[in-house]
């Protein structure tokens, strides 16, 4: 898959996750991730989107170079799904504008090249998996 194919997954899957979170409520338990609530899923995806955005934005070649303050302030519950959507938009905008020639840091010993596609693929997968998890809270 190419970058645009991954980007075509991230935004809509995030929108579906946010809609499911709004429908289920942030306190709903998630059967496929025991001990987690919808709020936990929303915060997790929002955090990993921001982490990937920071890794690409700072052109880190080692994960230790990613600034530790990439999260900013966590959202109040009423703003959690808007915060989630905003993070996905920032991630996609960052990936779209990034240089494919740079070998960005990843957490794999031998990542595929170009490593920008690693981040796009990973975030598409992560978002999709947790969107499905969120839907399990509604019995889907």
Regions found by a protein language model. Name each.
Residues 1-4, 45-107, 139-140:
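Short, helix-capping/interhelical loops that line the mouth of catalytic, cofactor-
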Residues 18-25, 96-99, 138:
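A structural signal for long alpha-helical coiled-coils and helix-turn connectors
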Residues 23-66, 109-140:
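Short, contiguous alpha-helical
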Residues 1-31:
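Non-cleavable N-terminal signal-anchor transmembrane helices
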Residues 3-10, 34, 77-84, 120-123, ...:
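Hydrophobic packing residues in well-ordered alpha-helices of helical domains and bundles
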């Amino acid at each position: 898959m190419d970058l645009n194919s991954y980007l075509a997954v991230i935004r809509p899957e995030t929108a579906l996750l946010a809609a499911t979170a709004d429908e289920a409520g942030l306190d709903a338990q998630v059967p496929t991730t025991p001990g987690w609530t919808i709020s936990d899923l929303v915060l997790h995806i929002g955090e990993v989107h921001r982490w990937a955005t920071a890794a690409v934005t700072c052109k880190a070649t080692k994960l230790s170079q990613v600034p530790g303050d990439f999260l900013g302030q966590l959202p109040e519950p009423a703003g959690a799904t808007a915060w989630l959507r905003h993070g996905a938009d920032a991630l996609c905008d960052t990936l779209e504008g990034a240089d494919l020639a740079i070998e960005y840091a990843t957490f794999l010993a031998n990542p595929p090249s170009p490593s920008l596609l690693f981040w796009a693929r990973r975030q598409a997968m992560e978002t999709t998996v947790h969107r499905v998890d969120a839907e399990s809270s509604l019995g889907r």
